[in-house]
Amino acid sequence: MAGLASGATTACRATPMSAATTGLPLRVRGIAKRYGDSDVLRGIDLEIAPSACVAIVGRSGCGKSTLLRVIAGLETADVGTVDSGRAPLAAQRDAVRLMFQDARLLPWKRVIDNVALGLGRAGRAQAQQALDAVGLGTRGNAWPSALSGGQRQRVALARALVHRPRLLLLDEPLGALDALTRIEMQQLIVQLWRQHGFTLVLVTHDVAEASALADRIVVLEHGKVGLDVAVPVPHPRAPGLPALASIQAQVLSRLLGTTQVPEPAAPKAQTRHGPPRGATAQDTSPLQRIL
């Protein structure tokens, strides 16, 4: 499925950014992938409804990015199929876009020309609409080197959105950003997903991020689905909601291989300031250390 990455240069006709769309259904059946002696994916089955937002989380090396690349067609599964409706997803490649942690902007092209790649004569007008949608409408003539990390990721998101995707795949796109910029980007992604209606599949190592964005979290472990849990919390989601904390604890419990995530102990009365004897100011609860 060439041309799925957000930096693809394959020519296509863009539709107006204001047009609504319907997300693609996604069905993954029996996907297995092996590298040498290592079974990275071992019989993955997933079914994702149109316009759903699903987060895939797991420990490093569990196969989550490999699964996303198989869905995108950048890797070929040894066994199994990836379909959309009654047809292979490969037949819908123009409706699929993939965004990486690295924005992959062309440094010799201005921002607006990076977004307009492959769009033909109407590309600049469509690119301007996409930049407006991600809050960078005035930065079209800037060079990528003049942008912050968060701004470069906004450009990469605009470059994907300008093609009006029906399936948007995000491979840890916010992993290199600072905490506040991550929150801003999370809010932007949710806003655009709700506005445009595409199906969204996000790979992340951040459980809090998964629960902030997704309406379903899938945990991969040892190349298989270990947990599949709904997040029935309406958007917008404020950090610290008890319902989100409960879901995060459930997911973390699975990732840590425990039956229960320890709750922070209630502090005892202190007669002096500072941490208890034997502790340091950096000591935190197990849950906080993971997050």
From Swiss-Prot:
Renumbered residue ranges of the record's region Disordered: 264-291
Family matches, as Pfam families: ABC_tran
GO cellular component, one term: plasma membrane
Coiled-coil residue spans: none
Membrane-protein topology: Peripheral membrane protein
Subcellular location: Cell inner membrane
Enzyme Commission code(s) on record: 7.6.2.14
Ranges of compositional bias, category Polar residues: 281-291
Gene3D superfamilies xrefs: P-loop containing nucleotide triphosphate hydrolases
MF terms (GO), sorted A to Z: ATP binding; ATP hydrolysis activity
Catalyses which reaction(s): ATP + H2O + aliphatic sulfonate-[sulfonate-binding protein]Side 1 = ADP + phosphate + aliphatic sulfonateSide 2 + [sulfonate-binding protein]Side 1
Annotated ranges, domain ABC transporter: 26-247
Record's keyword terms, sorted: ATP-binding, Cell inner membrane, Cell membrane, Membrane, Nucleotide-binding, Translocase, Transport
InterPro entries: AAA+_ATPase, ABC_transporter-like_ATP-bd, ABC_transporter-like_CS, ABC_transporter_ATP-bind, P-loop_NTPase
PROSITE patterns: ABC_TRANSPORTER_1 (PS00211), ABC_TRANSPORTER_2 (PS50893), SSUB (PS51291)
UniProt-listed SMART domains: AAA
Keyword DNA damage: no
Binding-site positions, ATP: G58, R59, S60, G61, C62, G63, K64, S65
Taxonomy, superkingdom: Bacteria
UniProt family annotation: Belongs to the ABC transporter superfamily. Aliphatic sulfonates importer (TC 3.A.1.17.2) family.
Quaternary structure and partners: The complex is composed of two ATP-binding proteins (SsuB), two transmembrane proteins (SsuC) and a solute-binding protein (SsuA).
Purpose of the protein: Part of the ABC transporter complex SsuABC involved in aliphatic sulfonates import. Responsible for energy coupling to the transport system.
Protein name, per record: Aliphatic sulfonates import ATP-binding protein SsuB 2
Gene: ssuB2
